[in-house]
Each structure stands twice: as C-alpha cells, then as structure tokens.
Amino acid sequence: MSQPAGLRERKKQRTREAIARAAHDLFVERGYQATTLPDIADAADVATRTIFAYFPSKDDILFSEISTMKEALERALSERSHGDDALEIVRTFIISTQAEATSPVGERIHQLIKADPALRNQLRARITQMEDIIAPAIAADLGTRVDDPGTQLVTASLIAGFNLLADRGAAKDDALTPQEITALIDPVFTFLRAGLEALKDRRPARRRRATA
C-alpha cells in the first residue's frame, strides 16, 4: 500500500534535514574539504546515491540553509495579504531567521565559509539568486513589471543589503548578533522605502489609481 502524499513529503523532509545536519556536524568536526559524500552518507545512515536525490552537490548541502531561507521567503511573499508591504516582510524575515545562524553549529559553518574565498563568493551568488523571488513582489508593490528599471533598481539594492550582511559577517570573528543585524539593515530599508515611494510618485496618475 502506498503512503499518503503528506506522509511521504514529511519523510522526505526528515531525510533531507538528517543529511544536512550530519554533513554540517562533519564539516565542523573534520573540515569542509576533508569531508566526503560517503562520510556524510554513513553519518546520516543513507546510501550515497540517496544524497543526490536531495542535494546535487556537497556545496548544496553546505548552503542548505540558504535554500531553505529562499523557499521560506518565497512562501512569505506569495502568501502576503493585500496591502502588506514586501519590504517589511523581507526585513522581518531577515531578523527572524538569525536564530539558526547564531547557534553553535551555525557559527562554525559561518567560520568555514569565512575562511574560504571560493565559498564566500558562492554565498554571494546564492544570495543574488533571491532576486528571482523578490522582484515579482517589488513589481507588484510598484504596479510595474519585473523588467521595469525601477523594480530592478529596488531589487538590486535589496540584494546589496543582503550581501552587506554577508560581508560584515565575514569581517567578524563570530556571527553577527541580532542587534548588529538590525543596526545594519534598518538604514538599508529606510533608503529602500524612500526610493520605493519616490518611484511610486513618478508613476502616471492613472496607474497609481489602478494599483491603489
């Protein structure tokens, strides 16, 4: 008898989390480069081929929290109520997702990435991929399209804010505290809100009425 879809999905999620947790523990214990996929499979009690059903590469396991964050942010933006501000949703999301980053394992993963320039560059690239989910929400707030210059400018500035956090985090010996994160991002979002309102004011009056 086949399992209900909900049960199958929960089992898959538990397996994915077990693989990521085992890998992160090994990365901290042995180092990222010294840890192999068979090592991870053995620690997670799965076959090596099973790992590829969840993660295309070892890098994807290391950055699994970024993927999880991206999915959660996409969900938060897609489920927002009419009138909810996309920028405030993103700001709240950034602050609320820092607990994992400041856990003991999270801080050690931070150190691993910080010590490797290639991994730091990959972190920036993965952050930049969030443009795909942020741009539609910004476009909706502006009443424009995702390829509109104003939408692209606000989205790129928001991604720059994410990368500012990553760069400041890399410059510290330990992870940024929630207070430091708030102090960094609040000026970014003040700037973005002002820019967003200025772009709204430049829209033709008819379009403003249609999107109000």
Identify the function of each model-found stretch.
Residues 47-55:
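Short hydrophobic/aromatic patch on the recognition helix
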Residues 91, 135, 151-159, 163, ...:
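Short, well-structured alpha-helical segments
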Residues 101, 141, 165-173:
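Secondary-structure edge/capping motif, primarily at the C-terminal ends of alpha-helices
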Residues 1-46, 63, 68, 72:
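Basic, helix-initiating cap at the start of DNA-binding domains
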Residues 59-61:
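A secondary-structure capping/hinge motif
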Residues 129-155, 172, 176:
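Hydrophobic alpha-helical bundle segments that form small-molecule/ligand-binding pockets
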